[in-house]
UniProtKB/Swiss-Prot annotation:
Binds 1 lipoyl cofactor covalently. It comes from Paraburkholderia phymatum (strain DSM 17167 / CIP 108236 / LMG 21445 / STM815) (Burkholderia phymatum). Residues 23-104 form the Lipoyl-binding domain. The keyword rRNA-binding does not apply. The lineage of its organism: Bacteria, Pseudomonadati, Pseudomonadota, Betaproteobacteria, Burkholderiales. One of its GO terms (cellular component) is cytosol. This is Glycine cleavage system H protein.
Length: 126
């Protein structure tokens, strides 16, 4: 199972990449897509909204289950990935290339609850 070292992770199996402009790109981990199975639907429900860390911002559905996707930090949801909305199963084949949404962190938004790759690996028994 792949856990890229350059990303941060949440307990709810989202990965987070900090971009040069300070925005955060968010997707689901390899572990999450494997647990979900074949992904058939994805929708960001909070586009353009200001959310708090831990708020549900999107839903992803597979043939087995539906799963909420959470904001890793407080901020504004500024973009959803249209490619994943059109072809959600792309997340199964490349979960770290097919991001779900981007969030602009609120001033002073804490990223303390994010884990590094080693801590995330331990949390899932890798």
């Amino acid at each position: 199972m792949s856990i890229p070292a350059d990303l941060k992770y949440t307990e709810s199996h989202e990965w987070v990449r900090t971009e040069a402009d300070g925005t955060l790109t968010v997707g689901i981990t390899d572990h999450a897509q494997e647990a979900l199975g074949d992904i058939v639907f994805f929708e960001v429900q909070q586009l353009g909204q200001t959310v708090s860390a831990g708020d549900t911002v999107a839903v992803i559905e597979s043939v087995k289950a539906a799963s909420d996707i959470y904001a890793p930090v407080s901020g504004e949801i500024i973009e959803a990935n249209p490619n994943v909305a059109d072809t959600p199963d792309a997340v199964n084949s490349a979960p770290y290339d097919n991001w779900l949404f981007k969030i602009k962190p609120a001033d002073g938004a804490s990223q303390d609850r994010l884990m590094d790759a080693a801590a995330y690996g331990k949390s899932i028994g890798e």
